[in-house]
Amino acid sequence: MHWTPEHAQPLNQWPEQHLDVSSTTPSPAHKLELPPGGRQRCHYAWAHDDISALTASNLLKRYAEKYSGVLDSPYERPGLGSYGDAAFLNGAKADPEPWPGPEPPYPLASLHEGLPGAKPAGAGGSAGLGGSPVVAGNLTEPLYTGNACGGPSAATEYAAGYGGGYLASGYCAQTSAALAPPPPAALLQPAPPPGYGPSAPLYNYPAAGYAAQPGYGALPPPAAPPAPYLPSGLAAPTPLPAPAPAPPRPAPYGFPGAAEGVSLKRKAVDEGAEARYRKYAYEPAKAPAADGAAYPAADDAECRGNGFRAKPPGTTEDGTGKYGGGGSLKVLGSPAYAPQLEPFDKFAERVPAAHGGFAEPSGEPAKGVDPGTLELVSSKMVDCGPPVQWADVAGQGALKAALEEELLWPLLRPPACPGSARPPRTVLFFGPRGCGKALLGRCLATRLGATLLRLRGAGLATSGAVEGARLLQAAFAAARCRPPAVLLISELDALLPARDDGASLRAPLLTCLDGGCGARADGVLVVGTTSRPAALDEATRRRFALRFYVALPDGAARGQILQRALAQQGCVLSERELAALVQGTQGFSGGELGQLCQQAAAEAGLSGLQRPLSYKEVEAALAKVGPRAPPKELDSLVEWDKMYGSGH
């Protein structure tokens, strides 16, 4: 039988509507005990095709209706209403005919008498089934009526879950009045031990719960089991008091002594690795020094800008107290080009080699150079501007990556490039005017933590051949005396005229490039810039190991440059206005975009006014400022890059 939501219908219709009789192989738990004679004859006739499947189904259905009449007994259900007498006049219950068969009907009890609330429970307590309180509430006092098998008879009142189909084969259905009823449940319980009494207290825990323990103390004791689970007559043990809260744990990150040297050493290695790679990320620009000198003179006490500090000559590193003894941890990192680096206890101090990276300076003064000229170069040519990071250069993403891979990494990490015998010491930037070639040179000096010296080729050319050669030699000598150093020579094509009439600086430049960047020039990087690379002869071109083309800024870079320049004028444009400006400034260089913003501010007369710049004023200035690089010049630069450029 299956339970369906239509249980509110008359009970005498349940077997008729919900009894599945079409199955010929039901499970033992659900098979009905139909009369064996008629059922066997029906199955025999159906198996031999004497009757059709429809006839067999009708016969089995009639047998089921006859048999289900035994289950239709009146059932009083308090609290849910009762059924009227007319509801039981129809169906199989109103059939007074006895069941025909060779065996008498089994005296089965109604299935509804075991439901909760059908009859009041007796006061005899729990009996049988282990004294379960659930079964005891549904059984009456005369529970065990004897039978021939020594167990409860089929007429015994069970709970709702127990049906006739679930009885074991050992249970007999015949009743027997000869057996006496079993003793009450109280007599079946064992006697308690002598040390226990019913007057002992049970679990007496407060109902309000436990107070919160501070910190991470011990867990509260488990809740007491309910009374029905305790055997009657056995006293529960006295509950243990709650343990005292654990003391607060000390701070997890401290600087203990030598006992935790291993963990602190591992932490120091991790910090060194993190600081080692942080230098090559695109970080924001750092604040300049208090005295305004972003690239100070290189001495033994100054930091090189890459996380290393020089060690005084003649001193040794004290290994004790490096990781223990309460001393503070030192900043660790990989070797960089700086004099007298601090040795790491895991690696020996690197000896400068002619094929490695930037080596330590000799400390000897430059020979063959006027001291006055050297002092003039040191005071006038050293760039003291703010440091420039990669984020300050708009666009040029591929060029930045190529410089990191082909120039900065070989210079700062010589062991990481075993294939190259010597890292490059010269680089040439060529491209249209105002594209940020000098800005890239300043950024290289910042990334290397080097002193920046700047020379203008046009200024050296106008000073004459003799004076220009003297200044050029003094600049290279000053760079060798102040390693690590970056010597930036802008407008390199001005030093190399088309005709070698004796007034050019080609020969002194080649001599300085060979000597200043030769085997004795460790720690010097020469950066040249030009907008006319075709003016360089083959000898000068071969002196520069790396040659990179700095193209005009793309749309995203132009938008970034315009936003920065207009923000200085107090102008904030919408996205649509900025997109219109970016589209209208195609072919502009970075310098020309800056001139556009200055022209708009000058026309608006913002020198003494507080009114911000508007889009109309910038649009009016756009009609007067345009790109200066002709397409023919751009095509020639692209062709020269294909022939002689390093590519990126």
UniProtKB/Swiss-Prot annotation:
Gene3D superfamilies, per the entry: 1.10.8.60, P-loop containing nucleotide triphosphate hydrolases (3.40.50.300)
Top-rank taxon, per record: Eukaryota
Keyword Methyltransferase carried by entry: no
Polar residues bias locations: 10-27
Gene Ontology terms, MF aspect: ATP binding; ATP hydrolysis activity; microtubule severing ATPase activity
EC number annotated for this UniProt entry: 3.6.4.-
A single Gene Ontology CC term: cell leading edge
Protein name per UniProt: Fidgetin-like protein 2
